[in-house]
Amino acid sequence: LQLHYQETGKPYIDGNNAISFSHSGNYTALMITQSKSAGIDIEMTDRNIEAGIDYFLNTNEIAFLSQQKKNLHALTCWCIKEAAIKYFNVSGIDFKNCIHIQPFELLNLGMPTVLIQHSQEEMIKICYRREKDFLLAYTVD
């Protein structure tokens, strides 16, 4: 397989396959699918992002965060938004005001709805999975 990059930085391979990849700590996530687009993100669960949530979460999203597991819930939202960006192949988008996650309960597995506003509004479902030391979020069409 030959790996190429679009002008936006999104990777692609020859043929009709979509590809997305991510890395965090010692983990790498790779998705290859025959769908038109794919987005995947992986994050280490020990990453502390609570102090920066105002940068990437809007007030509605901050309001639904679990108070007992606020950092983990915020990190899950970050992971979901990263997967959405990769899926839609947009760069320079405002994470806080252009990507909206519908309220969801923090579980080990979930599939919240995400609204992204760029050239047009689109809604997708993004799956997430939590393991002992990492989070994985992904979507395909």
Placement of each model-derived feature along the sequence:
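Core catalytic alpha/beta fold that binds nucleotide/phospho-ligands
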Residues: 1-141
